[in-house]
Every structure is written in C-alpha cells, then in structure tokens.
C-alpha cells in the first residue's frame, strides 16, 4: 500500500495519515463513552492485529475495523519505498476544546491517545526510487 501511495505523491508532497497509535497501552485506553470515540482490542497487540474503532454519532455508533502496526513496521515499510524522514505527531486539543471542557477532561486521552498522526514527506530521493521501481517517470 505504501508503494501505491508514494508513487502518487509529487516530489515535495507528503503523506499524512491518522492511524492507530503504535504505542497503545491496552489497559489505559480512554473510555469510548467519555470522548465519543475510542478503540477496542479483541486480543493481544501484534502487527496486523484487528482493532475496532468506535465513534458515537447522533445516528448511533459507527464501527470501523482497523489494524494495529508497530512503529518499527510503519517505518520499515516506508523506508523500503524510499521515505527517509518519518515524523510522528501526538494528538492535540485546540484552545476551544480546553475552554469548552477544561483540561481535566482531556487528561486521560492526551496521556494515552488511541490515534496518532504519521507524516512522511516525499523528497527527491524517494521520487527517484519510485521511478526506478515503476520503470517510468512520473510528474
């Protein structure tokens, strides 16, 4: 999948993905009911383990099956397709979120978030790698 994504990025473009936090602590996950979203782990964590993501909406719960991948796996796969600069960004609460609910409300989520943002810019070296792999020159 990373191969397909990276070939669509122009040099200087970047992959930004909201993904399951590879540093999940199963017994510290915030309650779905408290934040209106969360994850359920049906079993132990391992690369490829299914994870149920639940979002509580006005029309009822929305459930999505996702999969857990370790940070090492994400980074290894991205490096295989020529991405060298990989950044992880913790979830943040806006000033309005703090103002509306207070800091104490967000403490559990910020300490153990179920999601994280992965950012991987495509540089010129990655562009060359993709062209070699595809055997073509992409704009």
Q: PLM ranges: what are they?
A:
Residues 1-14:
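A short glycine-rich, Lys/Arg-flanked "PGG" loop and its adjoining helix->strand segment in the class I
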Residues 22-23, 91-93:
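Conserved beta-strand edge residues that scaffold enzyme active sites
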Residues 23-26, 58-73:
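Acceptor-substrate binding/catalytic loop of class I
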Residues 54-57, 92-107:
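Class I S-adenosyl-L-methionine
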Residues 65-88:
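Short alpha-helix
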Residues 81-84, 102-139:
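Core SAM-dependent methyltransferase catalytic element
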């Amino acid at each position: 999948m990373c191969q397909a994504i990276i070939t669509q990025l122009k040099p200087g473009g970047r992959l930004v993905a909201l993904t399951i936090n590879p540093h999940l602590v199963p017994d510290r996950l915030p309650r779905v009911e408290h934040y209106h979203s969360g994850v359920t782990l049906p079993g132990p964590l391992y690369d490829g383990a299914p994870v149920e993501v639940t979002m509580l909406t006005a029309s009822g719960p929305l459930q999505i099956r996702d999969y857990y991948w370790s940070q090492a796996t994400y980074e290894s796969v991205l490096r295989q397709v020529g991405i060298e600069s990989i950044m992880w960004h913790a979830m943040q609460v806006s000033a309005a979120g703090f103002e509306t609910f207070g800091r104490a409300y967000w403490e559990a989520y910020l300490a153990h978030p179920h999601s994280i943002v992965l950012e991987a810019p495509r540089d010129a070296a990655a562009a060359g790698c993709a062209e070699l792999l595809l055997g073509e020159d992409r704009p």
